[in-house]
From Swiss-Prot:
It is an enzyme of class 2 (transferase). Specifically methylates the adenine in position 37 of tRNA(1)(Val) (anticodon cmo5UAC). It catalyses: adenosine(37) in tRNA1(Val) + S-adenosyl-L-methionine = N(6)-methyladenosine(37) in tRNA1(Val) + S-adenosyl-L-homocysteine + H(+). Gene3D superfamilies: Vaccinia Virus protein VP39 (3.40.50.150). PANTHER family: TRNA1(VAL) (ADENINE(37)-N6)-METHYLTRANSFERASE. Signal peptide: none annotated. Keywords: Cytoplasm, Methyltransferase, S-adenosyl-L-methionine, Transferase, tRNA processing. InterPro entries: DNA_methylase_N6_adenine_CS, SAM-dependent_MTases_sf, Small_mtfrase_dom, tRNA_Adenine-N(6)_MTase, tRNA_adenine-N6_MeTrfase. One of its GO terms (molecular function) is tRNA (adenine-N6)-methyltransferase activity. This is tRNA1(Val) (adenine(37)-N6)-methyltransferase. GO terms for cellular component: cytoplasm. It holds the Pfam family MTS.
Length: 263
């Protein structure tokens, strides 16, 4: 991103309240994860599950957004990424709330005796095909180790009756994921289509499903205005995390604690 709202270091990102190192993770901190972590509904949440936590970004963002008594379980298959997530959590303000599990979610989930009000995932979405540079990156990007039907089934087994399961996906894949979820008995409750600017078609979609039927709220989020500054809606959604941003009028937007950062 140009005019990045977080401070980019060679090995990670510094946000307002925490630092995310990602040099040992196949998938780096990016706009998709930041959008999902800032967007997911957290009202009245009592327990959170992050499937495929990677660097721990989503778990850390949700810890910042929720009460201090809300525990977060973050499951990661890759041992290197899980270790880095554990280190990021240990250096954050919430080491007592976030537990990183180095495990396959397909093995971990059946052992759980509690259910989760919020389940969140930035899942792999490419079908197996062209090889990636490393097995770790292939695991993070491709659905071979966790296909969408399996992910939806695991979430269904772990969620509370009125909980939300939230994902971010490319637009077309998100549409197919939604149909698959509906066929499995999920109900789409929130949908935000994300476009880079007003002139472009949406390229990402944020989705929230629930076992419970109800009205579906849909909207559109544009990241940048015609002047290439962040839009008002994107700024409102993410400014609790970014150290600074540039608003629609070109002003720098600082948070109250932007001078103090972790890492």
């Amino acid at each position: 991103m140009s005019q990045s709202g977080s401070v980019l270091r060679r090995n990670g990102f510094t946000f307002k309240q925490f630092f995310v190192a990602h040099d040992r993770c196949a998938m780096k901190v990016g706009t998709d994860g930041i959008l999902l972590g800032a967007w997911a509904p957290v009202a009245d949440v009592k327990r959170i599950l992050d499937i495929g936590t990677g660097s721990g970004l989503l778990a850390l963002m949700l810890a910042q957004r929720t009460d201090d008594n809300v525990p977060i379980d973050a499951v990661e298959l890759d041992a290197g990424a899980a270790m880095q997530a554990q280190e990021n959590v240990a250096h954050s303000p919430w080491p007592h709330r976030i537990t990183v599990h180095t495990d396959d979610i397909q093995r971990w989930a059946p052992r759980q005796t509690v259910r989760f009000d919020l389940i969140i995932s930035n899942p792999p979405y490419y079908e197996p095909g062209v090889e990636c540079a490393t097995p770790q990156r292939e695991q993070a990007r491709y659905t071979a180790t966790l296909d969408h039907q399996t992910l939806l089934a695991i979430a269904a087994d772990c969620i509370t009756e009125d909980g939300f399961f939230c994902v971010v996906l490319p637009e077309q894949i998100g549409n197919a994921f939604t149909q698959q979820a509906l066929n499995m008995g999920w109900h789409l409750r929130l949908r935000t289509d994300v476009a880079e600017n007003e002139a472009r078609l949406p390229h990402r979609v944020l989705l929230a499903f629930s076992p419970q039927a109800g009205e579906c709220f849909s909207d559109r989020l544009v990241i940048r205005g015609s002047d290439q500054h962040y839009s008002e809606s994107y700024t409102a959604l993410t400014q609790a995390f970014y150290l600074f941003m540039w608003g629609v009028n070109g002003e720098r937007i600082d948070g109250p604690d932007s001078a103090s950062c972790c890492g």
